[in-house]
Curated annotation (Swiss-Prot):
The keyword Ligase applies. One of its GO terms (cellular component) is cytoplasm. Pathway: Cell wall biogenesis; peptidoglycan biosynthesis. The modification N6-carboxylysine is found at K228. GO terms for molecular function: acid-amino acid ligase activity; ATP binding; magnesium ion binding. InterPro entries: Mur-like_cat_sf, Mur_ligase_C, Mur_ligase_C_dom_sf, Mur_ligase_cen, MurE/MurF_N, UDP-N-AcMur-Glu-dNH2Pim_ligase. Its EC number is 6.3.2.-. Belongs to the MurCDEF family. MurE subfamily. Its main location: cytoplasm. The gene is murE. ATP binds at G113, T114, K115, G116, K117, T118, T119. This is UDP-N-acetylmuramyl-tripeptide synthetase.
Length: 510
């Protein structure tokens, strides 16, 4: 790939980002990066984030010929300096241009929501894999799948990658023969302009509840909601969960840039929908247990009926809250050209790493491993499992990450108080915080009249305690980490076997 400086400057000027060019030269860039360790000859280097001038010095020594920044640097006096008003926006635009605008060669379904993004994205990816003969890429919190070969699947570092990485991966997916892409879009992706300039073919808004609010994330809930809603502003067609909080705000944000005939609202049958906003598609539970569920979906509006969505669908991922996730995936993929039969033949065999993973025992109940990590997702998970216990207990093992998401901790205590019988508070990516202080903070929000509370900071021992204390009718929930193979401690990813592997090993030894 290559990018000439003249069209690059024109693109920045078109978006009113270009302030000035220092030492302009006729250049062709053969590499783009924001990481000085990845610089090669003829690189366009981006000065972003926690930038130090020494990074620019290093980049120029390694072959960078120009830099993009919001200010001039003396260290770059011999190179071309492209000075912009917003380096994150500039990086997104020039990244797309460098990689040949790969988004134009993909049908893109994008998901946002406080909870359910990953599960919904996996549902949609499985349906499209059937519909397109496996020509679908997936960018999720768990995996980046760029093709069908083992070496084209990678673990994700961010829910939505930095823009240069995003467009690099899109180009790789196209080169690998992919025609469709399902991706998660976080609120931070809009906050930090990682998806600036992107228009999605279908944007799905699942839900919104207070989360990711704190010193390192969103300053207020209004800012969080605004960033979430930008997905709808930048989508050709919108799919909205009619049961979301702030539905009026969400719906009319979508309507500001999208014609009503291209907005599809779905909801559970009988749900109370605010402001008389019309529901296009409804779903209802036909069967559920601890291992699967069956939903019936029906199109109500004329536009919904043209999708031929009506029918029953069996889901291999249990949980009443996953029924709405599956419905959203069915609608989005039908808009992408799939058929209802594609969904019926795939939704009953979807496996999502770290989401409602079930481990059975002979005499110690059933173990569930789930990534649930905020009040909304924990409440939904615990409530569903409590309903299924048949007089047994719900025993939970959980903690809260350090350095971010501090506003989640009261919600953790609230969810535990409402649905859990016994909780062991433990370590979950404490970062630079004291894990005991985090656990004690969660504990301060727990109603001790309802819940027995223990502290065990060694997560493996906490899991062992929970499993060994459980009996046949009990359910053990290992929440928050899913299949994460590490603990983030003081800036280091410390290896950890994962909740799934720890639980399986303990069960084998019982």
């Amino acid at each position: 790939m290559a990018l000439e400086i003249t069209p690059a400057l024109s693109l920045l000027d078109e978006h009113h980002l270009l302030k000035e060019v220092v030492n302009e030269q006729k250049l062709t860039f053969e590499n783009v990066t924001y990481d000085s360790r990845k610089v090669s000859d003829n690189t366009l280097f981006f000065c972003k984030g926690n930038f130090k001038p020494s990074y620019l010095t290093s980049a120029l020594e390694k072959g960078a010929t120009a830099y993009v920044s919001e200010q001039k640097y003396a260290e770059g006096m011999d190179a071309t300096g492209i000075i912009v008003t917003n380096v994150q926006k500039a990086m997104a635009l020039l990244g797309a241009a460098f990689y040949g605008f790969p988004q134009n060669e993909l049908f893109i379904i994008a998901y946002t929501g406080t909870k359910g993004k990953t599960t919904s994205a996996y549902f949609a990816e499985h349906i499209l894999a059937k519909a397109t003969d496996k020509k679908v890429a997936l960018f999720s919190t768990i995996d980046r799948v760029l093709g069908n070969e083992p070496d084209q699947r990678f673990k994700s570092d961010l829910t939505t990658p930095e823009s240069l990485d995003l467009f690099h991966d899109m180009r790789a997916a196209v080169n690998n023969g992919m025609t469709h892409l399902v991706m998660e879009v976080s609120s931070q992706a809009y906050k930090k302009n990682r998806v600036y300039g992107l228009t999605f073919d279908v944007g799905v808004f699942l839900n919104i509840s207070p989360d990711h609010i704190g010193r390192n994330e969103h300053p207020t809930f209004d800012d969080y909601l605004h960033c979430k809603e930008q997905l709808l502003v930048n989508s050709k067609r919108c799919v909205i969960n009619g049961e979301t909080a702030y539905l009026r705000d969400v719906y009319y944000t979508a309507k500001a840039t999208t014609e009503p005939e291209d907005i599809y609202v779905f909801a559970r049958k009988g749900a109370q929908i605010s402001d008389n906003i019309p529901v296009d598609i409804e779903y209802q539970n036909d069967f559920e247990d601890l291992h699967k569920s069956v939903i019936e979906v029906k199109g109500l509006s004329d536009k919904a009926q043209t999708l031929h969505v009506d029918g029953k669908y069996e889901l291999s991922v249990p949980g009443d809250y996953n029924e709405g996730n599956a419905t959203s995936a069915i609608i989005a993929t039908l808009l992408a050209g799939a058929k209802g039969e594609d969904a019926r033949k795939t939704l009953d065999r979807v496996h999502i790493p770290g989401r409602m993973e079930i481990i059975k025992t002979k005499n110690n109940g059933t173990i569930y491993v789930d990534y649930a990590h905020n009040y909304a997702s924990l409440k939904a998970l615990f409530a569903f499992l409590k309903q299924q216990t048949h007089a047994g207990r719900v025993i939970a093992v959980l903690g809260s990450p350090g350095d971010k998401g501090i506003s989640r901790r009261p919600g953790f205590g609230k969810a535990v108080s409402e649905e859990v019988d016994h909780v062991i508070l433990t370590t979950d990516d404490p970062g630079f915080e004291d894990p005991m202080k985090i656990a004690q903070e969660i504990d301060s929000y727990i109603n001790h009249d309802n819940v027995k509370v223990e502290f065990e900071l060694d997560r493996e021992i906490a899991i062992e305690k929970a499993i060994k204390m459980s009996t046949n009718n009990d359910i053990v929930v290992l929440a928050g980490k899913g299949e994460d193979p590490y603990q983030k401690i003081k800036g280091v990813d410390v290896p950890y076997p994962s909740d799934v592997n720890v639980a399986k090993k303990i069960v084998e030894e019982l």
